[in-house]
Amino acid sequence: MSSTPQRASAHTAIDVVIIGAGAAGMMCAIEAGKRGRRVLLLDHAATLGEKIRISGGGRCNFTNLDVRSENFLSQNPDFCRSALARYTAHDFIELIDKHGIAWHEKKLGQLFCDESSQQVIDMLKRECDAAGVQWCTPANVASVDKRQQFEIATDRGRFRCESLVIATGGLSIPAIGATPFGYRIAEKFGLTVTDLRPGLVGLTFGSDVLAFFADLSGISVDATISCNNARFRENLLVTHRGLSGPAILQISSYWRPGVDLSVDLAPDRDAEEFVFAARSSDKLLANVLAEFLPQRFAQRWVDANFENIPIKQISERQLREIAARLHDWRVRPNGTVGHKKAEVTVGGVDTRQLSSKTMEAREVPGLYFIGEVVDVTGWLGGYNFQWAWSSGFAAGQVV
């Protein structure tokens, strides 16, 4: 194994150029290099794998034990099936184990490094070096053209190759290098890019919603949240900015402006059965609901929506209304915090123009798109990294 990365010059013979040395790009480079292909990894950043480094609170949620196509958003929801089946979470776990990286399952199948996400970056670099991958970083790409071969002009020289792989990611977190470069290359070669928006991102709320949550910061509510046919059961956290937590991040990828979130505050019970069973009680409505909701939250919710009187004084009609509202409490966001803080970008290169088996552009032989730049977006919990590994592997078998 090489201890020093192989650096490429503009005179180096190259078969495959991969632009973007993140999770997908390095995985593709490893697999292509193993096949004896002469691979060059280009990246505009001097420090590689920054998104890996910051992920999972610095411990990298590198995959999930339960990966299915249903865990991904795309205009073509079946596109990811082939790649995910050919390189699975267990395949990546095997690679992690080979390098002696200790890991644990946190919750819901989410796997994290015991120590540091840097271990994953170092592992990928070692695998690249062992496969003979050459590096050219930092390198800024000025232009990409295709004649008989692809020609890539950079501030480090010009490179020619038979196969060009775009693994430049999305728009999320520009502070660590995200740019629209990959989308521009797709459009230059005639591919369509779908609408782009931030995903796994914090939502913002108007003054009316913020007034409701005033003084409730820190309260966590077990709830199911739904929007546009998507449903997630995770903790809902009240903050000074409104609602946050895993449930909000998950649903944000599905939310569109002007649409309400539906919150089920009683996901484990039949709310109507519960309130009718409590009818003989002298307790105030808020105190009854505090049997399964945090007391302060229950009080505020009742004060905002109903009259806080003894439940025995409430009519059957209104009890049914209370029960219905508990299962379908409507909250409308007014925006998101944007790409600068989003974990992913929803949308990307239209998958109808790519081969699901190889990631190659159907109308541009030798041009491949992998990872987040493609219109495949995973849920929170390691799914986006698995897509990076799987799509990178798929392209790496053929470039």
For each predicted feature, which ranges?
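Glycine-rich FAD pyrophosphate-binding loop
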Residues: 17, 33-57
